[in-house]
Amino acid sequence: MEKQMHIAMLIGALTKGGAERVLVNLADYFVEKGYRVTMVTQYERENEYPLNRKVNRIISDITEEETGKSRLLNFGRRFLKLRKIWKKERPDVILSFIGKNNMMAILTSRFLNIPVAVSVRAEPSEEYYTPLLKWLARHLFARADGVILQTRRCFDFFPAKVRKKAVILKNPISQSFFRERYEGERDKTIVAVGRVDANKNHEMLIRAFAQIAEEFPAYRLIIYGEGELRPCLLDLIKELNLTDRILMPGSIDNVADVIYKSAIFVLPSNTEGTPNTLIEAMIMGLCVVATDCPCGGPADLIENGYNGILTPVMNEEKMKENLQFLLNNLQKMEELGKNAAKTADIFRPEIVYGEWEKFLRSLT
């Protein structure tokens, strides 16, 4: 009988974000297919994605009693604790997501004969934003057995010795988004979904919508998500006297159901990897507008004017013009949405999960 393969996954926490959702989806797929899966997170937070009960969850952070005043000593304790986890669990492969977790996965598993795959989920220069982190990423990743990147542009950040072991793997998308495209009269809503922080730049979208709100009085802008900037944006909406036209309901679990009949989906981010929310909206056949941001995720998905609209980063005026154009051209909006729905063909779960499975198995 073939030995049950054991996959360990490492991430900071399972709070609601794109990378976390991808990893939770992967864990669910592998454990349901008969793999043994251990999810190692540094923390356990409120408002996390639910994890399949068959997945073993381990918290790797040091306890309050173990925490001292020295940051260096605390790092050493975290390092040793994570290394002990690898020694005890003996996974066949470690899959790490995001930033410093990737470095810790490589360092703590040294000489344990456990293959490591690290995944950069955003623009590398944003994830490794200091000269030291940049240097460490470029050198340490050469010691990984596999490197997973989001777009071709990401390859430029790394030296040849990293690029030669790097691959692009698509994001696994929840089955709930794969449904027949809605062909009826659409709700007069423009929607955005994502963490409410500076990088997502919902402020630009709010200000752009404010410029056309009077021209299109039937339309509302709805931004779904939580984050540190939510109170500030609610204040801005109040200042603009648009509290009845721009809504921020917070985080939701049933995204597919809620945005299914929406007129336009907007991604206003300053930087992105390959955005789950954009893929999900396109799969369901929404008309999409997205910033042409680094590291090129939206541009990899959208053929401008065919299956969506690409708009310049941090350009409120262009965002306004693109929304205005679409709301004045409903036939074009419908055409873009129909073409966007064709994206579903390349993101079928059986295809995407199969690519991840094949890659991880190739490392063992």
Please place each PLM-identified region on the residue numbering.
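Aromatic "clamp/platform" in nucleotide-sugar-dependent glycosyltransferases that forms part
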Residues: 251, 270
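Carbohydrate-associated surface elements
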Residues: 153, 172
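A short, well-ordered alpha-helix in the C-terminal region of glycosyltransferases
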Residues: 318, 325, 332-346, 355-358
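Short hydrophobic beta-strand element within catalytic cores of glycosyltransferases
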Residues: 287-292
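N-terminal strand-loop element at the rim of the active site
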Residues: 9-17, 21-25, 29-73, 157-159, ...
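A conserved mid-protein helix/loop that constitutes part of the nucleotide-sugar donor-binding site
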Residues: 20-25, 188, 192-217, 223, ...
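Short His-centered aromatic/hydrophobic patch
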Residues: 96-102, 120
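Conserved acidic donor-binding segment of nucleotide-sugar-dependent glycosyltransferases
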Residues: 303-305, 309-316, 325-330
